[in-house]
Swiss-Prot record:
It comes from Nitrosospira multiformis (strain ATCC 25196 / NCIMB 11849 / C 71). Keywords: Calvin cycle, Carbon dioxide fixation, Lyase, Magnesium, Metal-binding, Monooxygenase, Oxidoreductase. This is Ribulose bisphosphate carboxylase large chain. It holds the Pfam family RuBisCO_large_N. The basic functional RuBisCO is composed of a large chain homodimer in a 'head-to-tail' conformation. In form I RuBisCO this homodimer is arranged in a barrel-like tetramer with the small subunits forming a tetrameric 'cap' on each end of the 'barrel'. Its EC number is 4.1.1.39. RuBisCO catalyzes two reactions: the carboxylation of D-ribulose 1,5-bisphosphate, the primary event in carbon dioxide fixation, as well as the oxidative fragmentation of the pentose substrate. Both reactions occur simultaneously and in competition at the same active site. The active site is at 180 (proton acceptor), 298 (proton acceptor).
Length: 489
């Protein structure tokens, strides 16, 4: 039962605990139109979990540190966020190595948020509250976004279905690679790397997150050399090819200029970095839809707030926001690569990006049922420490609506870049054929690759070079409800 103070007592000057100010309502039944956020809270010593949850609700909606009489000039009972449930987090507290943590569920009325604005949504949900003294640590784990609010967003500019139609590529994952080294190449040498990768069988090549316009290579030179490579590789192979031209810059005006130049050169795709901010991302997504351009997002900077389990924000929330904002691609983990990624958590990320309707799945970190209405699907990108010898695992874990990006696994091939691309394309085609023939490609994966390598020297060399490479480290972000270990290869 709520312990809120009501009537004249509620508006007397002074400080009242958030729990008694109306921000804790255990009997509250969320409306279909409410936005619900689920936080992982570590309260300060001596602070009840309900008070900590109420404090988060208050500070992320209408409250300040003391009673203000101007509350009476608003429909404050409506506009207050309402913490309505707290649950102890499994495997925390007494008898464990971790302080006691709680899952806190908070409902927000839809009228608290500007339609179609990720910036306004985040200003409340992850604004001042993360520095609030009442909690020792705070992490946003998941959100339920009502359809009424989703419909105010554009969603992905292109979507998976239209992207495949434009590329004329179906029934398999797409293949890509990031140009390496990411910094230092001249424009001409950079373009040569792009050509070799595409000519060898990749669908895409990619700029890395921090290649923009530096003294060693101006952005315009890079665009010209890359598109020359794309056009030559397309003519040589008869396939539609692309290169993610990174238009990230210091101002929106510069980003629009670079995007327009990419369009004028015939590019099918441009790229931006997560660090440009939510408003800039939405702006570029609107431009991309207007100009029939695929929009790739590199999640640069994400791990600064998503990697630690007790504070920050789970990547699944970023996945939801970016689908709303309108990107077509986003890096979402590999399971078997060099970057952080628990198998169960990554399944939750991929489902969030690709499903029309996401059911509750606690083992995958999905705490809310989510109807995505008519928003397009996002194509997840798997990159970072993957190679041809893992192809059966990648197909099994990630499915076919994914882009597999083999950067070092292409450019580091002992016979060169084109041979590295050939190895990856042959490995993928062999695995897809085995799957389509009804073979158990997961169990027989190594054998399938060895059979293909008998007539493909680049694949044989790739398997020999990287067969013993593993990144078997413990994940920091694991499921709370199902014990799991990072996959080994």
């Amino acid at each position: 039962m709520s312990e809120a103070i009501t009537g004249a007592e509620r508006y007397k000057s002074g400080v009242i605990p958030y729990k008694k100010m109306g921000y804790w309502e255990p009997d509250y039944v969320p409306k279909d139109t409410d936005i619900i956020a689920m936080f992982r809270i570590t309260p300060q010593a001596g602070v009840e979990p309900e008070e900590a949850a109420a404090a988060v609700a208050g500070e992320s909606s209408t409250a300040t540190w003391t009673v203000v009489w101007t509350d009476r000039l608003t429909a404050c009972e409506l506009y207050r966020a309402k913490a309505f449930r707290t649950d102890p987090v499994p495997n925390t507290g007494e008898g464990t190595k971790t302080e006691q943590q709680y899952f806190a569920y908070i409902a927000y009325d839809l009228d608290l948020f500007e339609p179609g604005s990720i910036a306004n949504l985040t200003a409340s949900i992850i604004g001042n509250v993360f520095g609030f003294k009442a909690v020792k640590a705070l992490r946003l784990e998941d959100m339920r976004i009502p359809v009424a609010y989703l419909k105010t967003f554009q969603g992905p500019a292109t979507g998976i279905i239209v992207e495949r139609e434009r590329l004329d590529k179906f029934g398999r994952p797409l293949l890509g690679a990031t140009t390496k080294p990411k910094l230092g190449l001249s424009g001409r040498n950079y373009g040569r790397v792009v050509y070799e990768g595409l000519k060898g069988g990749l669908d895409f090549m990619k700029d890395d997150e921090n290649i923009n316009s530096q003294p060693f290579m101006h952005w315009r030179d890079r665009f010209l050399y890359c598109m020359e490579a794309v056009n030559k590789a397309s003519a040589a192979t008869g396939e539609v090819k692309g290169h993610y031209l990174n238009v990230t810059a210091g101002t929106m005006e510069e980003m629009y200029e670079r995007a327009e130049f990419a369009k004028s050169l015939g590019s099918v795709i441009i790229m931006i970095d997560l660090v440009i901010g939510y408003t800039a991302i939405q702006s570029m997504a609107k431009w991309a839809r207007k100009n029939d351009m695929i929009l790739h997002l590199h999640r640069a900077g994400n791990s600064t707030y998503s990697r630690q389990k007790n504070h920050g924000m789970n990547f699944r929330v970023i996945c939801k926001w970016m689908r709303m904002a309108g990107v077509d691609h986003i890096h979402a983990g590999t399971v078997v690569g060099k970057l952080e990624g628990d198998p169960l958590m990554i399944k939750g990320f991929y489902d969030t990006l690709r499903d029309r309707h996401t059911p509750v799945s606690l083992e995958h970190g999905l705490f809310f049922e989510q109807d995505w209405a008519s928003l397009n699907k996002v194509m997840p990108v798997a990159s970072g420490g993957i190679h041809a010898g893992q192809m059966h695992q990648l197909l099994d874990y990630l499915g076919e609506d994914v882009i597999l990006q083999f950067g070092g696994g292409t450019i580091g091939h002992p016979q060169g870049i084109q041979a590295g691309a050939v190895a990856n394309r042959v490995a993928l085609e062999a695995m897809i054929m085995a799957r389509n023939e009804g073979r158990d490609y997961v169990k027989e994966g190594p054998q399938i690759l060895e059979e293909a390598a008998k007539w493909c020297t680049p694949l044989k060399l790739a398997l020999d070079t990287w067969k013993d490479i593993t990144f078997n480290y413990e994940s920091t972000d694991t499921a709370d409800f199902v014990p799991s270990e990072t996959a080994s290869v």
